[in-house]
Amino acid sequence: MMYKLGVLLIICLLLFPLTAVPQDGDQPADRPAERMQDDISFEHDRFFDPVKRCCKYGWTCWLGCSPCCG
């Protein structure tokens, strides 16, 4: 019985290593400088109109550009 549990434990550790589980230190809230560098907002979208402060075309809203001009 103990042998089977040991084999099962080894198989589980090989399939799901502990390094695959995200640690607390890997959270974006702990790294504000990197979070600021990775800022991908709608203002950097090629369909965004900076004068109107909205997306140029209505169909671009389906692609994730927001807010829509209407």
From Swiss-Prot:
Chief location category: secreted
Disulphide bonds in the chain: C54-C69, C55-C65, C61-C68
Posttranslational mods: Contains 3 disulfide bonds.
Signal sequence annotation: 1-20
GO molecular function: ion channel inhibitor activity; sodium channel regulator activity; toxin activity
Keywords: Amidation, Cleavage on pair of basic residues, Disulfide bond, Hydroxylation, Ion channel impairing toxin, Neurotoxin, Secreted, Signal, Toxin, Voltage-gated sodium channel impairing toxin
Family under the similarity heading: Belongs to the conotoxin M superfamily.
Entry-linked Pfam families: Conotoxin
Superkingdom to which the source organism belongs: Eukaryota
Tissue specificity statement from the Swiss-Prot or TrEMBL entry: Expressed by the venom duct.
Subcellular location: Secreted
Residue numbers bearing the Cysteine amide modification: C69
Entry's free-text remark on domains: The cysteine framework is III (CC-C-C-CC). Classified in the M-2 branch, since 2 residues stand between the fourth and the fifth cysteine residues.
Residues recorded with modification 4-hydroxyproline: P67
Protein name, per record: Mu-conotoxin-like Am3.4
GO cellular component: extracellular region
Stated role: Mu-conotoxins block voltage-gated sodium channels (Nav).
Propeptide: 21-53
Coiled-coil regions listed in the entry: none
